[in-house]
C-alpha cells in the first residue's frame, strides 16, 4: 500500500506543469504594452478646425486702402495678386471701386488661421511699392516683416537738406540702395520721405542702421564697411 501511495504522489508531481515566474520589470512592461494597445484603439482623431469656426462662425475680413497713384499698378498686376491669395490661401479677394479698398475675406475652405493676415501683409507690401515677386515672400515665409519709417523720424530735415539725404540713401542710379539690399538680404522702397523695408527681423535692423547713418551724414564707404562687418557676424552666428 505504501508503494502504491508513493507511486501516485510521484505521478502528481510529474503531471504538475512548470510555471515561469515573471519579474516585476517584465510584468510592468507587459502592462504598459496592454495600456498602449487600449489607448491606440480608443484614441479619437480630431480634424483641424476651420479658420471660420475659430472666429465664431464669422468670416474674418481685412480692408487695405489703395492710394490713387497705385491704381494702375494694381490693375496691371491684379491676376498676380489674385492667384496666390485665392488658390494658395483659399481666401476671397476683391477691389471695391466705391471705397477704393482691397477687401480680403476668409471662406469655408480656409484652413490656415493666419491666412487673412498673410494676404493683407502681401497686398499692403505691393501697395507700398514692392514688386509682386518680392511681396509674395510674405505668404511663403513666416519670419518676414515690413517696417516703415520717415526720414524726419531720424533727423528733422527740410528743403535741399532733405533732398540730399534721400539722394545719399538712393545713391547714383540706385547703387547705394541696391548694395544695402544685397548685403542685408532685404528689399527697400524709397517713397518720397518714407522708407519701407521688407525682410527678416535681424536683416531689417542692419539695413535700418545703415540707412539712418546715411541720413545723419556718414560717408557711404564707412557705412558699407560697418554694414558688411555686422552682416558677416550675424551670418556666422546663425
From Swiss-Prot:
Chain ranges of the KH domain: 159-211
Alphabetic keyword roster: Nucleus, RNA-binding
MF terms (GO), sorted A to Z: RNA binding
Single biological process term from Gene Ontology: ribosomal small subunit biogenesis
Keyword Nucleus assigned: yes
Biased composition (Basic and acidic residues): 8-17
InterPro entries in the cross-refs: KH-I_PNO1_first, KH_dom, KH_dom_type_1_sf, KH_PNO1_2nd
Domain of life: Eukaryota
One Pfam family it belongs to: KH_PNO1_2nd
GO cellular component: nucleolus; nucleus; small-subunit processome
Subcellular location: Nucleus, Nucleolus
Region (Disordered): 1-65
Residues annotated as transmembrane: none
Purpose of the protein: Part of the small subunit (SSU) processome, first precursor of the small eukaryotic ribosomal subunit. During the assembly of the SSU processome in the nucleolus, many ribosome biogenesis factors, an RNA chaperone and ribosomal proteins associate with the nascent pre-rRNA and work in concert to generate RNA folding, modifications, rearrangements and cleavage as well as targeted degradation of pre-ribosomal RNA by the RNA exosome. Positively regulates dimethylation of two adjacent adenosines in the loop of a conserved hairpin near the 3'-end of 18S rRNA.
Family indicated by similarity: Belongs to the PNO1 family.
Quaternary organization: Part of the small subunit (SSU) processome, composed of more than 70 proteins and the RNA chaperone small nucleolar RNA (snoRNA) U3.
Name of the featured protein: RNA-binding protein pno1
Source species: Nematostella vectensis (Starlet sea anemone)
